[in-house]
Amino acid sequence: MSRLHLHLISDSTGETLENIAKAAIAQFDDVEVVRHFWPMVRSESHLDRIMAEVRASPGMILFTLVNGELRSSLERRARMLDLPTVAALDAVTDALSRMLGQEAKARPGRQHVLDAAYFARVEAIQFTVAHDDGIGWENWEQADIILAGVSRTSKTPTSIYLANRGFKTANIPIVPESPPPSALFNLKRPMVVGLTTGLDRLVQVRRNRLLSLNQAPETSYVDDERVKAELAFARRMFADNGWPVIDVTRRSIEETAAAVIKLVEDRASA
């Protein structure tokens, strides 16, 4: 089976870009696509952070950026890495421009009707980006969802996916030597969901991560006994607090997010 890293970079919520990617990927069999989702990209500093991740997981870049300078910067950086870039809406926009006899207006997210739902998604994405990896725990009560789990259990990409569906999502790494803030155990509004995974898969994912960063592949971070202890510690915490748990071992980001959303909806209807 072929494996492809696909980086989706958008200056808006990225919903249009994601739908295009899904439709295109569905045309191919026996391909494992690892999607990296980057919404609300509107500055060079944000692009700097993204390109660091692209370097670590090189692959195809599919984008919708209407800012000319940002777009040129992305394309230039991709060429330096010898990576292909595809502007998802260019062909359609160019055809419409020729037919209508007018230039398209370069405005980020112009394809969206600026209604309450759209603004809610934007707000959710901004909240989620600002509350990644345990940051901003003082504001957790404002969240809809808190994802907890050991390192490399897909907390961040799942959070971003949920944010694109309008859920303010924070996430917190569970580390035995560094207990989470006590606020995590006293939340009223958010639903806290534990993410776990199989030992073998987690060790492999972590080892691949170290290799992509050119770091020593044999450390306690990938030691079987150490990782097993981390998973057990996290599971005990989830059980002690009555938090629902989702095993992400064989789930895509979309499937994990769908399971989280169902938990939220079930609680709301209870």
Swiss-Prot record:
This enzyme's EC code(s): 2.7.11.32, 2.7.4.27
UniProtKB keywords: Kinase, Nucleotide-binding, Serine/threonine-protein kinase, Transferase
Annotated residues for binding of ADP: 149-156
Keyword Transmembrane helix set for record: no
InterPro entries named in the record: Kinase-pyrophosphorylase (IPR005177), PPDK_reg (IPR026565)
GO molecular function, one term: ATP binding
Origin superkingdom: Bacteria
Class of enzymatic activity (EC top level): transferase
Recorded catalytic activity of this chain's protein: N(tele)-phospho-L-histidyl/L-threonyl-[pyruvate, phosphate dikinase] + ADP = N(tele)-phospho-L-histidyl/O-phospho-L-threonyl-[pyruvate, phosphate dikinase] + AMP + H(+); N(tele)-phospho-L-histidyl/O-phospho-L-threonyl-[pyruvate, phosphate dikinase] + phosphate + H(+) = N(tele)-phospho-L-histidyl/L-threonyl-[pyruvate, phosphate dikinase] + diphosphate
Function of the protein: Bifunctional serine/threonine kinase and phosphorylase involved in the regulation of the pyruvate, phosphate dikinase (PPDK) by catalyzing its phosphorylation/dephosphorylation.
Similarity comment: Belongs to the pyruvate, phosphate/water dikinase regulatory protein family. PDRP subfamily.
Listed NCBIfam families: PRK05339.1
Name of this chain's protein: Putative pyruvate, phosphate dikinase regulatory protein
Native source species: Sphingopyxis alaskensis (strain DSM 13593 / LMG 18877 / RB2256)
